[in-house]
Amino acid sequence: IGDIEFDESQIINFPEGMLGMPTYKHYLLLQSAEIAPFLRLQSVDKPSLSFLLIDPAFIDPGYRAYVEKADQNRQYIQNEDSAVLVVCKIAKEGKDITANLVAPVVINHADMQGAQVVLLDSPYNVRHSLAEVSERTEA
């Protein structure tokens, strides 16, 4: 993919794709000091498609436990090799970044499978401002 070198074993398979984009099923999870603490979920199928992700522990330390409880029937989070991340969106002006806490991305690194799950009856918000988090950590 462009300048990105990767091994086939690094590809994460999303059998259902991401929400609203079921056609694209293969992604790479990329880390870069330039965008830390964010990660990039890069589509292998469509190089122009990527998602900005963050560990929700930066927002709410109890979020993973909530997702584990809410997702018992689907069991996407099967072991300690699973990561729970949330999709972020940057406003056009770049002044505000929001995180979707209602539809986390769960990646099981043991079998390289991923899914974006919707938490029904979630107390969380689809557009949770990261500015609130920044203000709390600076105080």
Ranges and model annotations:
Residues 1-61, 80-139:
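Long, compositionally biased stretches
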Residues 63-70:
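Short beta-strand-centered segments at strand-helix junctions
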Residues 66, 78-80:
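Glycine-rich, N-terminal phosphate-binding loop and its surrounding beta-alpha-beta segment
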Residues 73-77:
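Short, solvent-exposed interaction modules
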